[in-house]
């Protein structure tokens, strides 16, 4: 599980568009904390701080402690809005997490021991179907990543979610099938040559059938 980061914030009043623009010009980002059967709380956070967290690539799947004055709210980011032209953050929605809360998050998949896969050693290619897997997790036990060991996987193998060891109380949102995360595929050149060979064999078989028919 990832270490919980702290984000400092300040309370703000609901204001006009002009007030919000002034806030942004001062290097602050308007945000809101909602959920857990409590009233929404309007806050402002440092653009520099929230941008640095966002650029880690795992912002949306990490629990944060937001410090507002003398209190701390445990939250997880749920939406980030960007300025459409200059592509900088202009608003963030945080979901407040109560005790024993569960969350749905996208967790990245990491592959290990490529050199121990007979399929890859033979020239196969790791074809990643899902770079992330959507999981339901306790808010205090979100996996940093899912690790898949490629040892022993042959050419043509498929790696399914059942091959991944998930932490306790963590489950995929897709439960009606053993979905594929990756495959060990033959390189295009090998596939092309194999298809050509099959086409030639099929053609030869048809020619032999025609010849047999004429002899009859």
Curated annotation (Swiss-Prot):
Pfam families to which the protein is assigned, alphabetical: Ribosomal_L25p, Ribosomal_TL5_C
One term of GO molecular function: 5S rRNA binding
Coiled coil: none
Basic and acidic residues compositional bias, start-end: 195-216
GO terms under biological process: translation
Alphabetical UniProt keywords: Ribonucleoprotein, Ribosomal protein, RNA-binding, rRNA-binding
UniProt region (Disordered), positions on chain: 1-21, 192-216
InterPro entries: Rbsml_bL25/Gln-tRNA_synth_N, Ribosomal_bL25/Gln-tRNA_synth, Ribosomal_bL25_b-dom, Ribosomal_bL25_C, Ribosomal_bL25_long, Ribosomal_L25_dom, Ribosomal_uL5_bac-type
GO cellular component: cytosolic large ribosomal subunit
Keyword RNA-binding: yes
Record note on quaternary structure: Part of the 50S ribosomal subunit; part of the 5S rRNA/L5/L18/L25 subcomplex. Contacts the 5S rRNA. Binds to the 5S rRNA independently of L5 and L18.
Sequence similarity: Belongs to the bacterial ribosomal protein bL25 family. CTC subfamily.
Protein task: This is one of the proteins that binds to the 5S RNA in the ribosome where it forms part of the central protuberance.
Name the UniProt record assigns to this protein: Large ribosomal subunit protein bL25
Upper taxonomic lineage: Bacteria, Pseudomonadati, Pseudomonadota, Alphaproteobacteria, Hyphomicrobiales
């Amino acid at each position: 599980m990832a270490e919980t980061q702290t984000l400092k914030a300040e309370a703000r009043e609901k204001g006009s568009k002009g007030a919000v623009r002034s806030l942004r010009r001062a290097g602050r980002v308007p945000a809101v904390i909602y959920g857990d059967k409590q009233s929404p709380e309007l806050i402002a956070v440092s653009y520099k701080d929230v941008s640095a967290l966002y650029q880690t690539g795992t912002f949306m799947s990490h629990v944060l402690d937001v410090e507002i004055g003398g209190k701390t709210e445990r939250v997880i980011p749920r939406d980030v809005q960007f300025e459409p032209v200059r592509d900088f953050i202009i608003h963030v929605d945080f979901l407040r997490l109560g005790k024993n809360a569960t969350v749905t998050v996208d967790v990245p998949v990491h592959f290990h021991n490529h050199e121990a896969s007979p399929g890859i050693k033979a020239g196969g290619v790791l074809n990643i179907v899902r770079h992330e897997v959507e999981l339901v997790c306790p808010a205090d036990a979100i996996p940093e990543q899912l690790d898949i060991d490629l040892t022993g996987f042959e050419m043509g193998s498929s790696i399914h979610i059942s091959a991944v060891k998930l932490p306790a109380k963590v489950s995929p949102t897709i439960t009606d099938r053993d979905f594929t995360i990756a495959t060990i595929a033959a390189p295009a050149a090998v596939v092309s040559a194999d298809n050509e060979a099959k086409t030639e064999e099929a053609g030869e078989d048809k020619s032999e059938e025609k010849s047999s028919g004429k002899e009859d």
